[in-house]
Regions:
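Generic alpha-helix detector with strongest preference for long hydrophobic helices that associate
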Residues: 6-13, 42-46, 73-76, 92, ...
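Thiamine diphosphate
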Residues: 56-192, 203, 436-440, 446-479
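Flexible, low-complexity linker and terminal segments
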Residues: 2-31, 35, 174-429, 434-435, ...
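Short, glycine/acidic-enriched capping/hinge loops at junctions between secondary-structure elements
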Residues: 40-44, 61-64, 123, 211, ...
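N-terminal glycine-rich anion-binding loops that anchor highly charged ligand groups
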Residues: 27-42, 53-66
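Carboxylate/His-rich catalytic cores and anion/metal-binding grooves
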Residues: 39, 45-52, 434-448
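Secondary-structure transition/capping motifs at alpha-helix termini
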Residues: 37-44, 68-77, 98-107, 132-138, ...
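Short glycine-rich or small-residue beta-strand-to-loop segments that form or flank ligand, phosphate
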Residues: 47-53, 78-82, 110-115, 144-146, ...
Length: 479
């Protein structure tokens, strides 16, 4: 008779091995606990520091941190909710300087910054400065960027990657709750090794999901590159450190160290391949799961994919793209289809890497072979439209009758009218909320709304129009 395991609610934070059930937000709470335990096992006395500002899809992160306060304290982790996102980021920059002004209590402080897309935007100045300055070799910083691709609880449909690219911060894009944990641990190790802050993309599809995950200590084993030579003085934060020295270190060494780390740890990997592949699919994060669903719609499992000549390259670090892996993947392919939501980040990098090669496949993604729109950059991609894009290329390359039949069916589904909700409910303020009275304006007056719940005053009988970004409320009247 199989003995049932004794399960406790706190297992999501205290279990050291086996499998546990938790959601994406709870995985982010568990993550620093795991890092502290790993450091302790490796003989380091580290502490953790978490700061940021709430916002969907990270709207419940601070609440879950407060609930888990005793677990944070047991692991020397301090959580302070930020006044705003950029002040929080500056505090994390300061945490990396522990030990620079005398003897420190800890060997290093690992950090977590969190904020939704607009918070990433407003923190760009801090990100640039802090990433140039570097990190502590026993610290490191993860920047959790909450992206609301479909603008379900935001004023913009946000994609934060390009803000981080501008600051030259590497970006990890997890597919599912398990990879939130895995990539988080890789992220801190990478941050320490390369001296960079590391972004971790957090979408509602991942954060709001729940899953049973493996938390064994041996799941993520960090490997350090043997093909990268550290410059004299290393890559970590130091003082004094002139700005042009910081720039040279970032451009010439840090990003090369990032690519070497990705290569050594297999963060980008081939998920499906055969001997005579002609169509390669390059994808990442949530889009990887959509690609798998799209292939299922087409009746294509791994064995069928090998017959049809389809391969998949799953990118874990979407910027900078490690060049060796994608170049090897592209060998022998006739076409590469890049599947990613929003603006193309991977596609241009794939083209840049493959362009100098003597033999290279045609690369399509946002545009098709004729330069027409293929996978749109607005909204969110759905598995059905991805299935159509894949099937069209497979039909061209193989002429397979089964694919043709599936393609016809998928196209017919795309033409059907979307489902209409059985009942529409206009969002309103909660009972007892001060906004119920505070948003009422005197007769004959006009008001401008703010961001957040106050935004809803625009569709109420309150003579309220327009809105601003966070922190700009009222300033429109100046103009």
């Amino acid at each position: 008779i199989m003995k049932l395991r004794n399960v406790k609610l706190d297992d999501k934070y205290i279990a050291e091995e086996g499998r546990i059930f938790l959601n994406g937000t709870q995985a982010l709470v568990r993550l620093p606990l795991m890092q502290h335990a790993r450091d302790k096992k490796n003989g380091l006395r580290t502490a953790g520091y978490i700061s940021g500002y709430r916002g969907s899809p990270l709207g419940q992160f601070d609440q879950q941190l407060w609930i888990a306060k005793k677990h944070l304290q047991n692991h020397d982790i301090v959580f302070q909710s930020g006044v705003n996102e950029d002040i929080a980021a500056t505090a994390l920059w300061g945490a990396q300087q522990a030990g620079m002004h005398g003897k420190a209590k800890y060997d290093g402080v690992f950090g977590v910054w969190y904020g939704k897309g607009p918070g990433v935007d407003r923190s760009g100045d801090v990100f640039r400065h802090a990433n140039l300055a570097g990190t502590h070799p026993n610290g490191g910083v993860l920047a959790l960027m909450g992206d609301d691709h479909t603008c379900e609880s935001s004023t913009t449909a946000h994609q934060s990657e390009f803000a981080l690219v501008d600051a030259m911060m590497p970006i990890l894009n997890p597919a599912g709750v398990q990879e939130l944990l895995d990539y988080g641990l890789y992220g801190w190790a990478l941050s320490r090794y390369s001296g960079t802050w590391v972004g971790l993309k957090c979408m509602k599809d991942t954060i709001d999901a729940s899953a049973t995950v493996d938390v064994g200590d041996d799941r993520v084993q960090i490997r350090y590159p043997d093909d990268f030579e550290m410059p004299e003085g290393g890559l970590s934060l130091r003082f004094p450190d002139p700005p042009l020295d910081q720039e040279e270190r970032l451009h010439r060494y840090k990003l090369e160290a990032v690519k070497a780390f990705v290569r050594a740890n297999g963060i980008d990997r081939v998920e499906m391949e055969g001997e005579n592949d002609t169509l390669g699919i390059v994808t990442c994060g949530k889009s990887y799961l959509d690609v798998r669903q799209a292939l299922h719609y087409l009746g294509v499992d791994d064995d069928r994919a090998r017959q049809l000549g389809v391969s998949i390259y799953k990118v874990g670090m979407t910027w900078p793209l490690e060049p060796t892996g994608i170049a090897h993947f592209a060998k022998g392919l006739k076409k590469i289809l890049v599947v990613e939501e929003k603006r193309g980040l991977l596609e241009s990098q794939v083209k840049d890497i493959l362009y100098p090669l003597d033999q290279r496949p045609v690369v399509i993604g946002k545009k098709d072979e004729m330069g027409l729109e293929l996978l749109r950059s607005n909204g969110a991609l759905e598995p059905n439209e991805i299935a159509i894009a894949i099937a069209e290329r497979l039909l061209e390359l193989t002429g397979d009758q089964s694919i043709e039949e599936r393609l016809t069916h998928r196209r017919s589904l795309a033409l059907e009218s979307p489902e209409v909700p059985a009942m529409e409910r206009t969002p309103y303020f909660c009972s007892g909320c001060p906004h119920n009275t505070g948003t009422k304006v005197p007769e004959g007056s006009v008001a401008l709304s703010g961001i957040g719940c106050h935004f809803m005053a625009q569709w109420m009988d309150r003579n309220t129009t327009g809105y601003t970004q966070m922190g700009g409320e009222g300033a429109s009247w100046i103009g």
